[in-house]
Amino acid sequence: MTQSFPNETTLNDGAKRLENEGSGNFEESPAKRIKLDKPENPIHAQPENNGAQRKKGTAPIREEYLVRSGQEPSVKQTSDVRDDDEAEAARHQERAGEKGGKQRKKQKGQNTARKFGKSQDEKGLCQSVSHSPELSPRTCQFGDNCRFEHNLRKYLKEYKREDLKTFNGMCPVWDAYGLCFSGWKCRFVGSHMTERELEDGRKELVLVEDEERKNAAMPLVEGGAEGGVFNSISTEQKVDLMKKRRKTPKSDAYTTWLDETSKQLEIHNHGRRFADENNVEANGEARDEVEDRRAQFKEPPFLPSEKRRLYFGSETPVLAPLTTQGNLPFRRLCVELGAQFTYSEMAMSLPIVQGHKGEWALMKAHQSEVLPPTIKPNQGVVKDYDHSRDLKFGVQISANKPWQALKATEVMTALCPHLRVVDLNCGCPIDLVYRDGAGSALLEHPSKLEKILRGMNAVSNEVPVSAKIRMGTKDNSPTALKLIERLVLGGPEFTEIGQGPAGVAAITLHGRSRQQRYTREADWSYISECAALIRRLNERSDDLTDTIREADDRLQAPGRRVYFLGNGDCYSHEDYYRAIGESGVDTVMIARGALMKPWIFEEIQAGQYLDKSASERLSIVEKFAKYGLNAWGSDEHGVGTTRRFLLELLSFTHRYIPIGLLEHLPPRIQDRPPAYKGRNELETLLASDNYKDWIKISEMFLGPAHKDFKFEPKHKSNSYEIEG
């Protein structure tokens, strides 16, 4: 691609110019809405074409957009695609690369230990000056020993890069909130500063605030921090966790009970096996023993709190937990486009308990995520469901030991009041997580998994607990059916001591095994089997109640119903409604489909394909850039962070093939295109898998990259480093 973009290019002029220019080989195509003949109930919508003419694995690009050898420009996408859970665990896979040696060799073309360089001022501005008027800074605690700059005019002239001219030179943070949280460090500081003359004749630089914007940006929900961010804990609270000053009495008591009960069960079951081997028959005395067996075991130290009622339905598509890509700005974007529920990136339990700053940052949610979903169920569908108390944001954790998960759940639900659910990841396939005994390794230890979920349910206060699982760890040995029965009814160990169900509120099944990778499709027929099982178990829940004593409601799933979500390869509204109508899941969790085209939630809501024009797609990129600056700051560091995550997003969105270019519908997430061109230059640019084009797109909104900025995509062939 030879077209260059000056750093002052804006969406309004740059995008339109690219759409309207171009050689005669590019067709101009306005935004279109391709709508199928949809029946009244969109669940039963059928694809337009039966796919008989389609070549498996190849996107059916229309002849006029194919590029033959020697023609330019063109797009031919590579197939270095990671499956849903690999995308979810990207950050943890990178840790494996830090160990080097054999592990690094095993990754082959993958950049596992990625580095992104630095984006910072040549010399930083002291915090005592960063938000103060020029002539009245706060006192610096380091005095003459401070290594940062205190002369504001010198900093602005010599150490800070020139202001960005994107967004018409207006700071997106100041425009949204009436003040800029980056102060003098902002790359748009010229848009919210002025020089005033004092009574003594001196001139002073001051930051400007806008009261009208500030009032309009007041949070709609109590408890939010600056920028409408929720679940942000203080430095003091993190220090208390690091120094083990914050106690977790519930987790400690329940873990002790679990350990003692497990030992008793082991002794008891050993005795039963010995009796069976010696053909001891069950006489009257033995039957009496069965009835009073539970008296030999201690009761749990406390019962779970009553849980907030949940609802999942066909009108509530869910955004999957996505590490790296599932950051706050991206989730905010998806909620705006129609996602009803979101999850944090997968957080590791032990760092949460130890107060690690990076892990606690994953708990932060945007204001739009702590509001109730925009759609509520019909009256009476869910007993005692209170829509006003519901919210969209849940967290996902990973753990390999019960005490870690319990402590993490207890402190999270205590310190973060805006959580819909705490989800346990039991499906992460990454070797580092698996070898540690977490993620999909828990599928091989169902009793341990049940203990973890029971404990989490006991200490999570009113917040429900859920689990995300895979079909199993090996291709030909699916275990999800047995595991689901255990999680819904309770395993034999806990049933024997009268503890009943595990209390899990929802289960998500990814239709792949740990062994399986993206090259094969998710198994929705198996997901359908599991959905049928859960329906039967939910319908029979009253009949399956403990026969010795009635199980306490607090031990049951909220509302005595376990919701079931399917996950894997959902790429259109047709895939979504087919999964609900034919497979019988309550709703679908969407991962790669949302990364490749975030407006999939709009399509689901509309029940039709949306053929986004190139400028419409670029406006989504622009919106992500704005939300990134709001979340990470508009200073040099924040701009660099936003650029890094924008490039991560573009590494997925470039794989989207506009449906107006396809010969047959529906599009398939596994299909790869032959070399093709877009309907205009901008559309071709957005489809490029060349990292240089991704950088070019980022510069439309974030200006030229810092000289020390470096970007290493997942695949080594796409690395980028600024050349000074």
UniProtKB/Swiss-Prot annotation:
A zinc finger (C3H1-type) spans 120-153, 171-192. Keywords: Cytoplasm, Flavoprotein, FMN, Metal-binding, mRNA processing, NAD, NADP, Nucleus, Oxidoreductase, Repeat, tRNA processing, Zinc, Zinc-finger. InterPro entries: Aldolase_TIM, DUS-like_FMN-bd, tRNA_hU_synthase_CS, Znf_CCCH. Residues 29-41, 88-101 have a biased composition (Basic and acidic residues). Signal peptide: none annotated. It catalyses: 5,6-dihydrouridine(47) in tRNA + NAD(+) = uridine(47) in tRNA + NADH + H(+); 5,6-dihydrouridine(47) in tRNA + NADP(+) = uridine(47) in tRNA + NADPH + H(+); a 5,6-dihydrouridine in mRNA + NAD(+) = a uridine in mRNA + NADH + H(+); a 5,6-dihydrouridine in mRNA + NADP(+) = a uridine in mRNA + NADPH + H(+). Its main location: cytoplasm. Gene3D superfamilies: Aldolase class I. Belongs to the Dus family. Dus3 subfamily. This is tRNA-dihydrouridine(47) synthase [NAD(P)(+)]. The gene is DUS3.
